[in-house]
Amino acid sequence: VSRISQYANTQNKVNDADFTANNPALIEIEKFSRFVLSPITPENNMQTNWFFERARGQYKTLRSKEGFTKSRLAAFDLKYPKKQMFTKVELAKYINAWQEVYNGKSLVIGPHIVVRGNEKNYARFMNYNLPEIKHIDVAYFEDAIAKAILFKAADKRYGTKVSGNQIGELKQVVVPYTLSLLNIITAGKLDLYKIWKNQHISMALSDFI
């Protein structure tokens, strides 16, 4: 029955990731994303949220529900900036690119999995790299956002005219391998909390990437 339900919808493309939305650990991450506020920084004097979209379309639905007047819509956009919305598939990319995981002697999580594509990477994330609900706390969420900031910074570094480093489709490979190498070079001791507190990476780290 479960397999039938996965392919019953012929009007919209349904991904396997859509059927994991009710995973307790993902629900817990969603809870933290709604109440953990980003720190005030010199660049932004307002605390905002990083919106974890556990189920497809959540952000758009909530924005429509709460933004029924222009002022409320503006308030929603300030609280939940679109650039700080991320899906569970994106979360899997951010975390798997940074952290290698072994299952026995087999390397089951790493950049080599990220580059295989979103669905394969997400499946590995769910099987090997999503913690039990008891291990998901504020620190886990803040670290996850720091990894998101790192990934976005590297992605921008290698993919815009401004950066001067446009490398086309190679970016999909270079970004995860760069971040994995960074973690190895720093022996896993890069200060992720500092990235969370600043809400961006330092110029020195950006130049290194």
Q: Where are the language model's segments positioned?
A:
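C-terminal catalytic or substrate-handling cores of phosphate/nucleotide-
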Residues: 2-195
